[in-house]
């Protein structure tokens, strides 16, 4: 595979364990990566759990960190500037923003200012703790009406997520694409043979078992 000849889309997703990143990696694994591939924009300059996987698929990790700035206000300003320089210096043409509340539009504004031609806003959130912050509430309400002027494609994981993040006219006119979360369902289909073998291997054949699928972190 020669990923250097592929068209690359810059994706905003942390490279630690998480639902959004897992979805993007599942999609990436099923792409013809000779033609289309993802690069990943991250906001912290550190090694993350899944970055070796995406680097192995021909992706680049692009860092726009402001962690070196101690003052909270200056850190925010610095992050905006470094995001702008990241888009500009890397000649980014297509951005896939994995977001939730419309306050994430800050990144869209910076991308467009830096010359990004196409921005997809992909919402995965039908409600967020961000609404505990009054400033974020004000920003989200102010930004929503501006979204159609700056966002080229609207994607949502559900109708509720679309209602949460997008302007009413985008939702009412269904000017968004419904993208189900990327899960390979066949991997999780019930199999009686596997069930019996695993229970036998664990010595719990005739016992009541409570399982946890997830991470304790």
Predicted feature descriptions by range:
Residues 74-81, 118-121, 127-150, 163-170, ...:
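Nucleotide-sugar donor phosphate/pyrophosphate-binding loop at the beta->alpha transition
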Residues 7-10, 204-217:
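Conserved donor-binding/catalytic core segment of Leloir-type glycosyltransferases
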Residues 13-14, 66, 98-100, 123-126, ...:
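Histidine-centered beta-alpha loop that forms part of the nucleotide-sugar donor binding/catalytic region
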Residues 58-82, 94-97, 128-135:
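A short, charged, and often flexible helix/loop element on the N-terminal side
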Residues 189-204:
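A short helix/loop element that forms part of the nucleotide-sugar donor recognition site in Leloir-type
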Residues 149-189:
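A short, active-site helix/loop in glycosyltransferases that binds the activated sugar's phosphate group
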Residues 10-18, 28-75:
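N-terminal strand-loop element at the rim of the active site
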Residues 94-116, 123, 127:
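An aromatic- and histidine-rich active-site surface loop
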């Amino acid at each position: 595979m020669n990923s250097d000849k592929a068209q690359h889309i810059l994706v905003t997703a942390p490279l630690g364990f998480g639902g959004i990143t897992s979805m993007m990696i599942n999609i990436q694994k099923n792409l013809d990566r000779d033609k289309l591939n993802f690069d990943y924009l991250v906001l912290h300059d550190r090694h993350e759990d899944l970055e070796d996987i995406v680097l192995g698929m021909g992706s680049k990790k692009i860092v726009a960190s402001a962690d070196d700035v101690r003052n909270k206000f200056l850190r925010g300003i610095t992050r905006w500037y470094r995001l702008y320089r990241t888009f500009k210096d890397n000649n980014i043409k297509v951005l896939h923003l994995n977001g939730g509340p419309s306050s994430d539009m800050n990144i869209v504004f910076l991308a467009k200012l830096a010359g990004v031609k196409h921005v997809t806003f992909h919402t995965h959130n039908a409600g967020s703790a961000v609404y505990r912050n009054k400033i974020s509430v004000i920003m989200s309400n102010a930004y929503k009406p501006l979204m159609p002027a700056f966002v080229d494609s609207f994607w949502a994981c559900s109708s509720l997520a679309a209602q949460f993040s997008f302007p009413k006219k985008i939702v009412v006119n269904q000017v968004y694409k419904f993208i189900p979360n990327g899960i390979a369902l066949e991997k999780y289909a019930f199999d009686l043979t596997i069930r019996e073998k695993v229970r036998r291997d664990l010595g719990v054949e005739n016992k009541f078992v409570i399982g946890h699928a997830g991470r304790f972190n």
